[in-house]
Amino acid sequence: MASRKEGSGAAGGGFGSAKGKGKAAAAGDSAVKQVQIDGLVVLKIIKHYQEEGQGNEVVQGVLLGLVVDDRLEITNCFPFPQHTEDDADFDEVQYQMEMMRSLRHVNIDHLHVGWYQSTYYGSFVTRALLDSQFSYQHAIEESVVLIYDPIKTAQGSLSLKAYRLTPKLMEVCKEKDFSPEALKKANIAYENMFEEVPIVIKNSYLINVMLWELEKKSAVADRHELLSLASSNHLGKSLQLLMDRVDEMSQDIVKYNTYLRNVSKQQQQKHQYQQRRQQENIQRQSRGEPPLPEEDINKLFKPPQPPPRMESLLIAGQINTYCQNIKEFNAQNLGKLFMAQALQDYNN
């Protein structure tokens, strides 16, 4: 069970699978092709962040539902309560079990299908999230993690994405070997660590009718304010976070290059040692003396420990996420500039 710290979630190892009438996925294929979320679940996640989320502190919770064929239906959720390290008596597993037992008593879907987490400017590609999602998927194959971005949502566009670990990454995590050779053999790169699952938000017919009536009653206001450029604080913060991750990547590259230099240096030392031994044996043979006894060269020259490369892959994935966010932000603002210029030219 993963501890609930920033960027982590509680694993679902102690709960039963949510598989309903769906069939098991074939080896190497994703068990979930689509995520269907009730509108009530989306509102609960947003409400949870508004009540307890502050700054870069994340909020997390449990997703409940069931699996039908290759579709994961999320019908309910409940939050993890905020607590500090001083709350030594708080038991997350017991809390989750009591919540799910209470939901079962009132005939609400109580099967564990994943977890959700808020993010701060897209900062969610972390080792804590990787470990938590691996625990979920290892226990319940169909589990997903929902990433909610409150900053993008506040700008007028709901940002809610579902992710799963790819089968390749699941195998690597099971082996717990994150050496450069193991990741290269598994062909793991930051592009194929996570897979995004399409999301469909479903509402009841009555809610859809109510939304349609509200849309009809809403007064038509001046829409020119929609062309206002977004705050530059968003771009500045994203660039600052991007530079921080680039610095971390640079430090990891220096460590890896140091490891490669040490390996090369040791190979040269081993080669020189073997040549000296060979020349000395030739001289001893010419003098009629027995050759030197065989020695385990690996004991004399212990290979340097390779640095784990998983952190570098996660940093690269986070850098890619920041770049995509900056790209979307700039594309929206450039579009607004062109539209504003066209309107100004038209009015003139």
From Swiss-Prot:
Residues 267-285 have a biased composition (Low complexity). InterPro entries: eIF3h, eIF3h_C, JAMM/MPN+_dom, JAMM_MPN+_peptidase_M67A, MPN. It is found in: Cytoplasm. Residues 35-169 form the MPN domain. It holds the Pfam family JAB. One of its GO terms (biological process) is translational initiation. Keywords: Cytoplasm, Initiation factor, Protein biosynthesis. It comes from the Eukaryota. HAMAP family: eIF3h (MF_03007). This is Eukaryotic translation initiation factor 3 subunit H. It comes from Taeniopygia guttata. The gene is EIF3H.
